[in-house]
């Protein structure tokens, strides 16, 4: 079955728009930290006939017939996830990281319970108690931040907050924190106050799987993640734990607690991605992701642009633009004009609103998939610096655009395996 050709013939309008998106991805430098490029194999699994199958329930315990093959696929996804992260149990059904987090909340908490998570403006996530999210509406949310001097986590200050507020759940794991996380230290705090510990490793899951970032699995009561970002799979969620009693609660919280039928085509794509991440080449890839982020941070600082915490231990580089008198909103627009995709982001103790911000968040996972190395990322840093430091210079703007085009041509996306739809 030639799906690209079928789409081209069946709906040329959608096919044309997909082609335009492919061209955009090929011709732009993707630096959004939460994005990556899934392999053709992952995309093939997600676009398969599994789209047609309903399969409410768990493998071998379904509410529908005809599930023998999706059972085998989901069991394989579960086993690969357990092997990849060294966990005793996994649920591969959550549709997203947010769904995974909410399933954990449903299993462990009651409305009004206290949760302790990182402040969104310091690098946390909406689902960790933000007042605009259900996690902040249904539960009493207390937030910790980073140290004002080091811009890194201070476990003693977090411990004092925990002792004061006695949370039922502590959340660690973030969306814009560039440093390594001491999961054992967090577990000690959780045990001291009698709290559950949830690690949301959505951003660093691939690095954890490859062993280039400490794993939360041995230390936390439960771990959630997305399956894209650094893990390079389809967009989806995953829950892991080592406790059989918790596992039963989490299974019920996913179905029927928060979801109906799982997306078995996405589950298959997750299984493919987990299989890819179990290969030795994925460890090399993940090591390169971190090396590239450190090269990017180092060169940007050499060019006079501040980096939050002075560097990075993972794939995230968070720029603090206050020193050059620029907002994140303006910087986001400036780099987009030379075909670099990033996102404005708050920085710790940011005086600007979340709609303006003082920061620009960069990530290295996607371009590392395209084969970028440290030298290429140093060049990327120069392009960014040239653009941000010379916003009114049309000649420099064009030169930046030309350098982006050259970098993209030297590091093609997908190449012969391109999922292009055009005839």
Swiss-Prot record:
Gene Ontology biological process terms in this record = glycine biosynthetic process from serine; tetrahydrofolate interconversion
Q: Which cofactor does it need?
A: pyridoxal 5'-phosphate
Q: What class of enzyme is it?
A: transferase
List the EC numbers from the record: 2.1.2.1
Write down the chemical reaction(s) this protein catalyses.
(6R)-5,10-methylene-5,6,7,8-tetrahydrofolate + glycine + H2O = (6S)-5,6,7,8-tetrahydrofolate + L-serine
N6-(pyridoxal phosphate)lysine found at: 229
Assigned keywords, A-Z: Amino-acid biosynthesis, Cytoplasm, One-carbon metabolism, Pyridoxal phosphate, Transferase
Site residues (Plays an important role in substrate specificity), renumbered to this chain: 228
Q: How the protein assembles, per its UniProt entry?
A: Homodimer.
Concerning its family, UniProt says:
Belongs to the SHMT family.
Record PANTHER family: SERINE HYDROXYMETHYLTRANSFERASE, SERINE HYDROXYMETHYLTRANSFERASE 1
What is this protein's function?
Catalyzes the reversible interconversion of serine and glycine with tetrahydrofolate (THF) serving as the one-carbon carrier. This reaction serves as the major source of one-carbon groups required for the biosynthesis of purines, thymidylate, methionine, and other important biomolecules. Also exhibits THF-independent aldolase activity toward beta-hydroxyamino acids, producing glycine and aldehydes, via a retro-aldol mechanism.
Q: What is this protein called?
A: Serine hydroxymethyltransferase
Native source organism of the sequence: Synechococcus sp. (strain RCC307)
